[in-house]
UniProtKB/Swiss-Prot annotation:
This is Hps1-dma1 cluster O-methyltransferase. Its EC number is 2.1.1.-. O-methyltransferase; part of the hps1-dma1 gene cluster that probably mediates the biosynthesis a derivative of cyclopiazonic acid (CPA). The hybrid polyketide synthase-nonribosomal peptide synthetase (PKS-NRPS) nps1 might incorporates acetyl-CoA, malonyl-CoA, and tryptophan (Trp) and utilizes a C-terminal redox-incompetent reductase domain to make and release the tryptophan tetramic acid, cyclo-acetoacetyl-L-tryptophan (c-AATrp), as the first intermediate in the pathway. The active site is at 331 (proton acceptor). It comes from Dothistroma septosporum (strain NZE10 / CBS 128990). InterPro entries: COMT-like, O_MeTrfase_dom, SAM-dependent_MTases_sf, WH-like_DNA-bd_sf, WH_DNA-bd_sf. Signal peptide: none annotated.
């Protein structure tokens, strides 16, 4: 790494030391790109680029470079300017909302340009307002104006062309989270520490006293966004099943069973099945997900897969399975509900059963990669809008203890670099390990 110290913290950083570190890290990243035939990076490019697939040492250097550049920016600005800049970011939200809502991404040619006047006619938006909002987005490096009166894609706006997940994430942020954001304080003042899916900031925003997630899923516009967001989650670097298949010792015998609790259509279980060619799977979820899973499962796996309609707040019908697998389930729910979900699994576990929880582990400030910390705390705000939660390991430990069942964390498999979730294995206290 050219002798650079990648563990340096903000409190130790000075402008000169950061400058030296940035130069060293840039050499590592640029050297990798050049040696592997990547084109010179440019904000004006509209090519699809994924940099997170680099070797682990290069990826670590790249992530540290992003953090060091941010630290350099903060140290170069005055504290007043830095705080003002954070507040000014809010002003870009109306522009991002318009880009998503009016599907402007689709109306700007990927390789070319379009006048503001023609774009305004196409999407039926007043030209002056459209121009002002898009120029606000450009101040955040989204889109570009190659000549006066014309708009074109750049690398950031083109990313939403290439990534369906990013597009649906933008839509969900603007249509589902943004209305809830001003209601966080009101939720605290009205409900205090009462955290249910029916007392959430989003529930206040959408004026519903029911489970707000279920309310949104009942509205066609919101349902389409949420379903497609989940469908394309695999596009996100570090969210795929590779960590599961490479770092956990799954059962392998034909008489062993893995229960995928809330497993949607079973896509993750199918990925696991490729590495354990004999074990059987039971995938449990809502009726529509079960039907989808049955139709998507290839013929060579059908004899090993059972799909079962199941509400995970009710008694678990599969007893003594080898592994009960919960992937990205608990973070959707307040603590009381999460405890109920865990308890239903615990009551079904036999002496040698394991429960495997795949979730993001939130680190304390100053621990780990600042980039990961930013993602984790940001995602926690998204979850808080619906009274869900991203959790620390200690928080998971508390949930497990509160089940009142004789279960405990037996192992934690921390996520490797670039992966966004860890694995928490839970066993019965009287189990043989």
């Amino acid at each position: 790494m050219g002798g650079s110290d990648h563990t340096k913290t903000s409190s130790q950083s000075t402008l000169r030391s950061l400058s030296d570190e940035i130069s060293s890290l840039t050499d590592v990243v640029a050297g990798f790109l050049e040696s592997n035939g990547h084109p010179e990076r440019s904000l004006n490019s509209t090519d699809s680029v994924r940099l997170s697939d680099a070797p682990e040492d290069v990826e670590a250097a790249r992530r540290r470079l992003v953090t060091a550049l941010h630290e350099m920016t903060l140290l170069t600005m005055s504290p007043f300017e830095a705080v003002r800049d954070i507040l000014l970011e809010v002003s870009s939200l109306p522009a991002l909302h318009a880009i998503s809502h009016f599907e402007i991404i689709d109306h700007v040619p990927l390789d070319g340009e379009i006048s503001y006047a023609e774009l305004a006619r196409k999407i039926n938006v007043p030209q002056r307002r459209l121009t002002r909002m898009l120029r606000a987005a450009m101040s955040r490096s989204i889109f570009q104006e190659p000549r006066p009166g014309y708009i074109a894609h750049n690398s950031l706006s083109a990313a939403m062309v290439h990534s369906k997940w990013l597009r649906y994430h933008a839509a969900s942020t603007m249509e589902n989270f943004l209305p809830a954001a001003p209601k966080f304080v009101e939720q605290i003042e009205r409900f205090g520490d009462r955290e249910t899916r029916c007392t959430s900031p989003a529930g206040i925003a959408f004026n519903t006293e029911t489970d707000c997630i279920q309310y949104l899923l009942s509205q066609p516009k919101h349902q389409q966004v949420l379903v497609n967001l989940m469908k394309h989650t695999g596009e996100i670097s570090g969210m795929g099943p590779q960590h599961l298949t490479e770092h956990y010792d799954w059962p392998k015998a034909s008489d062993q069973i893995i229960v995928d609790v809330g497993g949607a259509s079973g896509s993750v279980s199918r990925a696991i099945a490729c590495g354990v060619p004999s074990v059987r799977f039971v995938v449990q979820d809502r009726a529509d997900a079960v039907r989808q899973g049955e139709s998507e499962t290839p013929s060579e796996l059908k004899d090993r897969f059972t799909f079962q309609e199941y509400d995970f707040f009710q008694t678990q019908p599969v007893k003594n399975a080898d592994v009960y697998f919960l992937r990205w389930i608990l973070h959707d729910w307040p603590d009381e509900d999460a405890v109920t979900i865990l308890r239903q699994v615990a009551l079904a576990m036999g002496p040698t059963s394991k429960m495997l929880i795949a979730e993001r582990l939130v680190l304390l400030p100053g621990e780990g990669d600042p980039w990961d910390q930013k993602i984790a705390t940001s995602m926690d705000m998204f979850m808080m809008a619906f009274n869900g939660s991203e959790r620390t390991l200690e928080h998971f430990q508390s949930l497990i203890e509160n089940t009142g069942e004789a279960i405990e964390i037996s192992r934690v498999i921390r996520r490797p670099n670039g992966v966004q979730y860890s694995l928490i294995e839970v066993a019965r206290k009287d189990s043989e390990r």
